[in-house]
Every structure is written in structure tokens, then in C-alpha cells.
Amino acid sequence: MSFAPLQNDTFLRACRRQATDYTPLWLMRQAGRYLPEYKATRARAGSFMGLATNVDYATEVTLQPLERFPLDAAILFSDILTVPDAMGLGLSFAEGEGPRFARVVRDEAAVAELAVPDMEKLRYVFDAVTSIRRALDGRVPLIGFSGSPWTLACYMVEGSGSDDYRLVKTLMYSRPDLMHRILAINADAVAAYLNAQIDAGAQAVMVFDSWGGVLADGAFQEFSLAYTTRVLAQLKRTGVDGTDVPRIVFTKGGALWLEDMKGLDCEVLGLDWTANLARARALVGGAVGGPGKALQGNIDPNVLFAPPEAIAAQARAVLDRFGAPHTDRGTTGPTHIFNLGHGISQHTPPEHVAALVEAVHGHSRAMRAAAGTGRA
């Protein structure tokens, strides 16, 4: 399998803690309902799953934000719940209600039926990865992704989204043995799923631990972090084109546990808007020439409802909090990938996204010029 040479490797360089000409930027849920063209494609598809399971539609919507904005990476259009759906739990999306499973996993009998699914059931995802990679034609890298074992378990036990996670936490505290069995199966399934995306052409992969932050200290390490670690240990390090595949881990609400996550076998840690970027850089970013993690994030998505000049000011503030960029191309050092602290809201005005992208690219170039690189 061969693909066009990569023209913009800024995102991948930042993942590897290599110096870049500017701070790369992409957005969680960048292909989504805030774009009118997405809504038009979604209407043609007839349903969310009709969109996600159709290779042509998934390719089309993945590329839509790149046609509008000079983003530095594309991310596969899919859903984190495709894996438990392939386990036979019956995923559906009711209009205005979000995802729902027809079958839930709350007792020993249900857990006994769980197994790592046949990846052929997810062939539509891998075919979409290859299709998107070809359609990108080397423009920017493609990110594959999955939900974390814990986050998938939340939906599998609750049956849908939750405000208090009462059912999954009840199982966790009353039958930790069952929860560990669910999480072990999930971890092995997620690893197989991400490896298949890598084989299909993904150039980086991301684990979304969207609900890790709802756990108590101690429970996070036991029920979330340990199983993210199990996923990472199984991931392929090299993509189909022979280059390394950076691994990104994002735990929403995880700033409390940065020192724990420092030990994860991944290249990038994603941060939500509650994290202090300067503190995160000091804790896990590493020094020039030494080991460390690249950092991704972390502007509040609701900033995008402010006027463009306020958006630009907030973007500059995030960049300034990370601090002076690493500029020595002869070695590695602290790097920053600009992103939101969580997914973009469906109500976001697209022109406000344009203002954000312009501000990030412009200010980050100016920061490097001020640092004396002469490459602004």
C-alpha cells in the first residue's frame, strides 16, 4: 500500500518533539455539525450511522474542514462506540438523544459473552482510513482514534451517556472483578482496532479517555490508566509507509494526574481547558535534548462563541502560557499542538474557527521570530 508523499509534516514533527516553523493546529470534532456542508452530507446519508459506515461519505466529511481552514491534520470521521457495536451491543443514534446500546453489560452473564470482535466487522472503518488517506493526497497527516477502555465501558454499562455514571461506578465498586474483565477485553479490542487503522494508513493514533476524569483518585489509576497502558503496549510503532506512528492520549479532566500519565508509553498528552499549560510543560514536557511528552490543547471550546478579536486574544494567551517554543532543529524539546480542550460545539460559527486558526498560526510564527529563528 503506497500513498502520496506528505507535504505538511508540522503536526507529526510536533508529536515527535521536533522544532516546527509554527504551532500546528487541528480540532477535536473538526468534521461535524457546525459546518453546513456536513449537515448536507448527513442529510444525504439519512442517519449518523449511515454516514459513518459509508466510505465515500466518511471521506467527504473528513475532508470538509480542510477545504475551509488551513488545519495541520485530518482526523478520521467515525465514532468511539464502533468497537462495542462490533461486540454485538447494538449501537443506535436517536435524533437529539445521542448514542444508545440495545444491550448493556451489567452482570456476569453479559460479561461472559464479551469478546474482542472480529475486526472484519469494522472493515468500513479501515476502508475509510485508506480512502481518506488517498483523498488527502499528502496534504496533511491522518489521525486514527478509539475510545479508551474505561470510556467504552461507561457506555457499555450505562447503555448511553450519563450525568452521574451511577451504574458503571456501582459495578466498579461492588464487582471490581467484573469491571476488570470488561476493561481487559476492551483494551485488547482497542489495540487491535487501532493497529488495523495503522495498517490501513493512519499516521498517528489517539486514545480518547473522555470520561477518565469522572473517577476518584486511585480509581483512575486502577480502572482507566492501567488499561490505557495495556492498549499502548500492544500498538504498532511503524505505519504502512515505514515511518513511526505517534500515539496521543487525551483524558478529559485528567490534569490532576499528569505525573501519573508522564509514564505512559505515548508521544503526546492531550489536555482539557482546566489544565495549566505552563505547569504541564514543566511536569511532562521535558527539556531540550531530553525525554518528555508533546502537549496538545487546550483552549475552552466556548471561547469560539466570543467575537473574533476575543478569540484571537485567548488563542495568543494559550500559546503564551505554553511559552517560548523549542526551535533547535538539531534536537528534540518541548512542543505544543494547538487544539480545543474538548470537542467543538455544533453551534460554533465557522468564521470563528477561521479566526482561531489565523491567530494560532500568526502568533506562533511571531513567537518563533522573536526567539531569533529567522523563520517567521
From Swiss-Prot:
- Gene Ontology biological-process entries: protoporphyrinogen IX biosynthetic process from glutamate
Task: Report the EC code(s) recorded for this entry.
Answer: 4.1.1.37
The protein's matches in Pfam families, at most eight in alphabetical order, are given as: URO-D
Any one Gene Ontology cellular component term annotated for this protein: cytosol
Give UniProt keywords alphabetically.
Answer: Cytoplasm, Decarboxylase, Lyase, Porphyrin biosynthesis
Instruction: Name the positions where substrate binds.
Output: R29, Q30, A31, G32, R33, D79, Y155, S210, H342
Give the highest taxon in the source lineage: Bacteria
Site residues, Transition state stabilizer = D79
The pathway noted for it is: Porphyrin-containing compound metabolism; protoporphyrin-IX biosynthesis; coproporphyrinogen-III from 5-aminolevulinate: step 4/4
Q: What is its main location?
A: cytoplasm
Which transformation does this protein catalyse, written as a reaction?
uroporphyrinogen III + 4 H(+) = coproporphyrinogen III + 4 CO2
CDD domains listed in its UniProt record = URO-D
Q: Where in or outside the cell is it found? A: Cytoplasm
Question: How does it associate, per the subunit comment?
Answer: Homodimer.
- Function according to Swiss-Prot or TrEMBL: Catalyzes the decarboxylation of four acetate groups of uroporphyrinogen-III to yield coproporphyrinogen-III.
Designated name of the protein: Uroporphyrinogen decarboxylase
> Where does this protein come from, organism-wise?
Paracidovorax citrulli (strain AAC00-1)
